[in-house]
Amino acid sequence: MRDPAFPGAAMAYHPFHAPRPADFPMSAFLAAAQPSFFPALTLPPAALGKPLSDPSLAGAAEAGLHLSALGHHHQAAHLRSLKSLEPEEEVDDDPKVNLEAKELWDQFHKIGTEMVITKSGRRMFPPFKVRVSGLDKKAKYILLMDIVAADDCRYKFHNSRWMVAGKADPEMPKRMYIHPDSPATGEQWMAKPVAFHKLKLTNNISDKHGFTILNSMHKYQPRFHIVRANDILKLPYSTFRTYVFPETDFIAVTAYQNDKITQLKIDHNPFAKGFRDTGNGRREKRKQLSLPSLRMYEEQCKADRDGAESDASSCDPAPGRDSLHSPLSAAPSPLRLHRTNREEKFGADSDQELDRREVRSARGHSPVGHRSPPSSPRLEDRGKDKSTPEKKSDSPESRKDGGSGGDSLFNSIRSLEKDKVESRRKEDSKSDPECGSLSKETYSPLMVQTESPPHLSASHLQSLAFSGLHGQQFFNPLNAGQPLFFHPGQFTMGPGAFSAMGMGHLLASMTGAGALDNGSLSSVQGASGAATPFPFHLSQHMLASQGIPMPAFGGLFPYPYTYMAAAAAAASAMPATSAATTMPRNPFLSSTRPRLRFNPYQIPVGIPPCSNLLTTGMPGSINPGSESSKPGSSRESSPIPDTPGHKRSHSKSLSPKASMKDSINELQRIQRLVSGLERQREVSPGRESPK
């Protein structure tokens, strides 16, 4: 029920001593409005009468307060003596109330004030704030407010103005908002303006937070009440002095209807950031990053910072994230690459360019987070091949054409090796066409290393019983310091060598076992066309002299035997032909991705910088200063930098005087194996390794 208001007065004052029960049901005061004080307090309408003077009647009213509902822990605190519930002695006061920010309220009122209501509750703007005067300084007062319907109409905003759209909806439960400082003395209330800025409006009829419940598209009038009482329990039978300010009426909406109201809120409310074009929030920062000028600036800064680095190196994961990488994942996840790429390159040209960078970086770089220097030949070559279409790394053509980019590759090798590389490249162009399937780094030492691009193509590594090893951390037992170097032409392995070390069935299970039965395994040294024998079964005392601990079963693999040989033991019992024919059907053995899902501990044993396992044990074209041994190379993630002593440890180059007949025989065997494996690969091209 709306209280009468006097339009000509700046302050409407209407005291009423005996309100009807429908005006102020006690549930509006206590049941929901102040749950922390009165969780389940209900009062009958009769309790809203005049102050009780008879002590017996006061006791009856106290019994009607249902104090038992307050819980046992509240009973002692809220039980009042009859004297405390008696009215206070009469105090001569004449309260006067003035509305704060009246000019701002008038601006809103001329246009038609709107207040947004939400399910979670929304504060009012302008906030309801008044200044009180004329109170007794010593007496205690309770200040509260409520919001009641201004009329019984429903409204709609049509043709830039509010119009009556019909009869009002059923009224929501009435709730009184008691100021949190109540009760307080008149002196305290008059010292500063009384603000109800914490009052929240909601349209949730089942609200449990004590918010004021309103209907959308209805007009409401806030009311301010002063009650002289020293206890909230006296509210039901105390005198209310109600003050109504007509300029504070508003229409409750779920979204602003009038653009002028929206602009007024933006101009005067410092918290109305949701409507502003500029701000410090995430939404505004996202808009700023999408501006073309800022995108160009981001690209320019990125280019200046990266210099000549390729796209793949800019897609490297952050160093903080590298410590969490498992060393057995063959390539970083494209999803992770996509996310980091979008985080680091806001100014990417298009989604198509992003996809190309993902594929290129997933093919070519090690996820161990070391950035490659601009002088890395593989990155330079990749940068020159940007304009060419993407090659499918799984197709046989791309593997056979792996050596076609040799001209552009060796142009960027350091000046110390130019002559040697030029001579090798010329000899390579004259060699057998099958040798072209060797990758671009054929003549660099074969680092038995993890997750790096293979020094041999996938087809040759399969023929060498290394299909599961060329992309995985398998041969790096120290995982730090200088890696083990094996030149492609420097191991000639017979089945006896593997069985002597306890690894025959292991390597036989990883690829077709026919390679082991055909005699000694060797790769082709493209420079001379000859294979140089190097005994693979290194003695334990030789490895111990280099500071390399040998595992229990005598092999070079530093991992527990049960991890690797459990699945391989069954495969070793099969014939060579059956192992070769059933291999493509088994995803564990067919794919070139890593199979062994264990995470070995790093062995903190370092190799002396001046002594190398292969500089003393094997003669070969191993140049420790070559591109494979650069600490920042894209194929090596060794955290130990090169030392001058390591760079000075040169060995004599190999004399190409091996038997041509042996090399031709080995080449023919490898060619037969490659052709057979290629046919098997084409039968099942989409096979993926188990996750």
UniProtKB/Swiss-Prot annotation:
Gene Ontology CC: chromatin; nucleus
One Pfam match: TBX2-3_TAD
Annotated coiled-coil segments of the chain: 659-684
Amino acid composition bias (Basic and acidic residues), ranges on this chain: 340-361, 378-402, 415-433, 678-691
Subcellular location: Nucleus
Record region (Disordered): 301-440, 612-691
One GO BP: positive regulation of DNA-templated transcription
Organism superkingdom: Eukaryota
UniProt keyword Nucleotide-binding, yes or no: no
Skewed-composition ranges (Low complexity): 325-335, 624-639
Key words, A-Z: Coiled coil, DNA-binding, Nucleus, Transcription, Transcription regulation
InterPro entries xref list: p53-like_TF_DNA-bd_sf (IPR008967), T-box_DNA-bd (IPR046360), T-box_sf (IPR036960), TBX2/3_TAD (IPR022582), TBX2_3_RD (IPR048387), TF_Brachyury (IPR002070), TF_T-box (IPR001699), TF_T-box_CS (IPR018186)
GO molecular function, one term: RNA polymerase II cis-regulatory region sequence-specific DNA binding
DNA-binding region extent: 104-277
Main location: nucleus
Reported function: Transcription factor which acts as a transcriptional repressor. May also function as a transcriptional activator. Binds to the palindromic T site 5'-TTCACACCTAGGTGTGAA-3' DNA sequence, or a half-site, which are present in the regulatory region of several genes.
Domain notes: Repression domain 1 (RD1) is involved in transcriptional repression.
Subunit and interaction comment: Binds DNA as a monomer.
Family matches, as PANTHER family: T-BOX PROTEIN-RELATED, T-BOX TRANSCRIPTION FACTOR TBX2
Listed name of the protein: T-box transcription factor TBX2-B
